[in-house]
Amino acid sequence: MTVTELALATPYMKAEIRDGVGWMTFNNPERRNAMKMEMNEAIVEILGAFQADDAVRVVVMQGAGDRAFVSGADISEFEANRSTPEGRERFDAVAAAAGRAFKSLEKPLIAKIRGFCMGGGLATALQADIRITADDGQFAIPAARLGLGYGVAGLQVLVSLVGPAMANEIMLSARRFTAAEAGAMGLVNRVVPVAALDGAVDELAGQIAANAPLTVKAAKAAIAEVVKDPERRDLARVEHMIEACFQSEDYIEGRRAFMEKRQPEFKGR
């Protein structure tokens, strides 16, 4: 197995590529992977590198250690970074850039969750296409206990997943929800025992990585357009991507492999 590590400016993030999977790790375990501003800056670099590398078929993000995915923003930085209008503007710009990097990623993104997934950590997990949590996962948005405001953009995905009633309970109570509760409300795709988490994520990532990249890309794009307001949908972009699938070498390979009763070897072209 070939492993390629990305050199990053911060020790609080790690990134590597192995077997067609890009792994992005939030590496601040002493603070339960609380998100520092420099970690948001690194997200832009990491996802940009994964997007540009044809060897990466799918991306998995995870927290270091066994206590947390991301426990939220690093509140110890608030005084330095968010106590003035200028500081908040800078912080918001960095966070917005990370958000754009997530939205620009055309490859499937899986969130692998253990332990705390709170506040900004839950917002980060909601950027994923698929969320798999161990049964020790804990979820919350404690903004109401911190005096923070959440805008429409920050709540759009949450409401689309769990509906307005559960979104209200999450936001207004600021309480913690168990992994079982998160699964029942549709906040996560799957809840598995702690011991089964690695295998479940590895299996799913491998399945996606083995599929035709152009088809996977087109499917992700189409689903993203479906959940938009009708007047904001870019249907022409999706149609172009679908046509690219039918014109691809992989379409020929897929049909040939089916007829020959073998596994296809897709190239992404």
Residue locations for each model-derived region?
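Helix-loop "lid/cap" segments that line or gate small-molecule binding pockets
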Residues: 170-171, 222-226, 240-246
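Terminal peptide-recognition signature
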Residues: 24, 28, 43, 61, ...
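Amphipathic alpha-helical segments at domain termini/boundaries
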Residues: 1-27, 175-209, 217-226, 254, ...
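Short, active-site-adjacent cap segments at secondary-structure transitions
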Residues: 66-70, 117-119, 140, 223
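Conserved CoA-thioester-binding segment of acyl-CoA-metabolizing enzymes
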Residues: 1-62, 100
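Glycine- (often His-adjacent) and acidic-residue-rich active-site loop
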Residues: 63-101, 147, 230
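Crotonase-fold acyl-CoA enzyme core
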Residues: 101-214, 247-248, 253, 262
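Charged catalytic carboxylate motif
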Residues: 38, 42, 94, 101, ...
